[in-house]
């Protein structure tokens, strides 16, 4: 099954997708926030184009599992997404996905400008990979 991964941010949101078999994740695009309506129009356009079976969203938590302001912002984003799409939504705890993606890109020799263009997509890839590594019976969509 194909999934779409999201690394949500208040300025930039990274999007990644899996192959049709749901085995490998690939960076897809970065959506730059302008207005909420424009953001969701672009996101839903990608969803329509990719036709995933579900959407996987990274949920940033502190090391001890505590929630932060960005955690609440992600939860609000997920609530708005669920009002606009009937696809199942999965949350995956993520720590440092953007930081680690940035480090990987720096080590690969990308300039700051090049890293800025793709770091959120790479973070979305990491989120999808975390999801794909879960046993099938632990991939539980949000209810309600």
UniProtKB/Swiss-Prot annotation:
Could be a nuclease involved in processing of the 5'-end of pre-16S rRNA. GO terms for molecular function: nuclease activity. It holds the Pfam family RuvX. This is Putative pre-16S rRNA nuclease. It is found in: Cytoplasm. Belongs to the YqgF nuclease family. Keywords: Cytoplasm, Hydrolase, Nuclease, Ribosome biogenesis. It is an enzyme of class 3 (hydrolase). The keyword Cytoplasm applies. GO terms for cellular component: cytosol. Its main location: cytoplasm. One of its GO terms (biological process) is rRNA 5'-end processing. The keyword Cytoplasm applies. Disulfide bonds: none annotated. InterPro entries: RNaseH-like_sf, YqgF, YqgF/RNaseH-like_dom, YqgF/RNaseH-like_dom_sf. Its EC number is 3.1.-.-.
């Amino acid at each position: 099954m194909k999934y779409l991964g999201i690394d949500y941010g208040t300025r930039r949101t990274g999007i990644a997708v899996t192959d049709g078999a749901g085995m490998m994740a690939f960076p897809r695009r970065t959506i730059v926030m302008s207005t909420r309506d424009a953001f969701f129009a672009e996101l839903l356009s990608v969803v329509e184009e990719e036709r995933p079976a579900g959407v996987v969203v990274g949920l940033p938590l502190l090391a001890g599992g505590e929630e932060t302001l960005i955690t609440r912002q992600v939860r609000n984003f997920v609530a708005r997404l669920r009002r606009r799409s009937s696809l199942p939504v999965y949350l995956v705890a993520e720590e440092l996905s953007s930081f680690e993606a940035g480090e990987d890109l720096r080590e690969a020799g990308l300039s700051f400008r090049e890293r800025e263009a793709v770091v959120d997509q790479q973070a979305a890839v990491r989120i999808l990979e975390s999801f794909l590594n879960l046993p099938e019976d632990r991939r539980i969509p949000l209810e309600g």
